[in-house]
Amino acid sequence: MKFGWIKTTGNDLEERMESVKDALESSIPGIIAEKEEISSVRELGNIKIVSDNLDADVVLINKGEDLEILKSAKLSGKETGVYVVINTKEDEVYATDVSKLDFVDYVVLEGSDWTIIPLENIIADLFSEEIKIVSVVTNVKDAEAAYEILEKGVDGVVLIPKDINEVKDFSKLIERMNSESVKLDYATVTKIEPVGSGDRVCIDTCSMMEMGEGMLIGSYSRGMFLVHSETVENPYVATRPFRVNAGPVHAYILCPENKTKYLSDLKAGDKVLVVNKNGETREAIIGRVKIEKRPLFLVEAEYNGENLRTILQNAETIRLVGEDGKPVSVVDLKVGTKVLIKPDENARHFGMAIKETIIEK
């Protein structure tokens, strides 16, 4: 996972604390601050503080300072890092060497001209090391380039922002860099029938979804259906753009890092994966899960000779995504309708994808 920090900027403490507020409001996870600012930062909110003080969450020293400080910090349970300004080849060698010490978690690299920082050399030298490489930049364009160097890129970026808009753009960049892409394809509906009542799960998230977005749900791990969010206007009920009426308690849902969970296991605070019709994803936090007894529909579809099934609530507001990329209500499904699914050859063990023969029916 890529991460980002903000470095406090401003002529006085009040201005520098505005940087902290911007970071908090934009969900930036960390801030590099001066040691005299630590208490003020903590008063503003819960954010990882990186500073040259043992009161920080990450103890960060400059090149040339005593590494014994980091040893002590590590023993006290802190994360540690070294800040290196790259001006010469000797600086590059130092950064590589210090990164291989087992008590150093981060190496933070800054150069007077970012474009000539030998990040490629350092990334290549440290490819198999546990160290997290962090680059200091002054704009979002350079941040994106740093994340993508040698495909692997740096693990994190420190942005020295000009204004709140740049912080917001940085936050969006981090979200995009961490978004997973899933391969979707079309399956052909072969059967739709009511099956009686059961306990179905509504997932209410802390995010507003858009047309074409939903979640991947299914009775089988080998094929999950894109169940559309409640973003479609309806004369009978108001839209609920934060909600996916997902299906019964037994069904799988695709979560971040290609893991699955049972719908019955979800709870407030969990993260789920919002997926659009193009397979682009983003994370959403669950605010509430509602389990209620409702009438249910069985939906069967065929994909490459495989029979896939899912069960959904029997209601006109429950939708899959059709061949034209538009939502189609379950009450309008017909034999031959094509709907988006995520095919998967892997079985699942405690939500993890594994290579194993498994029969689901």
Swiss-Prot record:
It catalyses: 2-amino-2,3,7-trideoxy-D-lyxo-hept-6-ulosonate + NAD(+) + H2O = 3-dehydroquinate + NH4(+) + NADH + H(+). It is an enzyme of class 1 (oxidoreductase). It comes from Methanococcus maripaludis (strain DSM 14266 / JCM 13030 / NBRC 101832 / S2 / LL). Disruption phenotype: Cells lacking this gene do not require either aromatic amino acids (AroAAs) or p-aminobenzoic acid (PABA) for growth, and growth is similar to that of the wild-type strain in minimal medium with acetate only. One possible explanation for this unexpected phenotype is that a second, presently unidentified ORF complements the function of aroB' in M.maripaludis. The keyword Transport does not apply. The keyword Oxidoreductase applies. InterPro entries: DHQ_synth (IPR002812). Catalyzes the oxidative deamination and cyclization of 2-amino-3,7-dideoxy-D-threo-hept-6-ulosonic acid (ADH) to yield 3-dehydroquinate (DHQ), which is fed into the canonical shikimic pathway of aromatic amino acid biosynthesis. GO terms for biological process: amino acid biosynthetic process; aromatic amino acid family biosynthetic process. Pfam families: DHQS. Keywords: Amino-acid biosynthesis, Aromatic amino acid biosynthesis, NAD, Oxidoreductase. This is 3-dehydroquinate synthase. Its EC number is 1.4.1.24. Transmembrane segments: none annotated. GO terms for molecular function: 3-dehydroquinate synthase activity; dehydroquinate synthase activity; NAD binding.
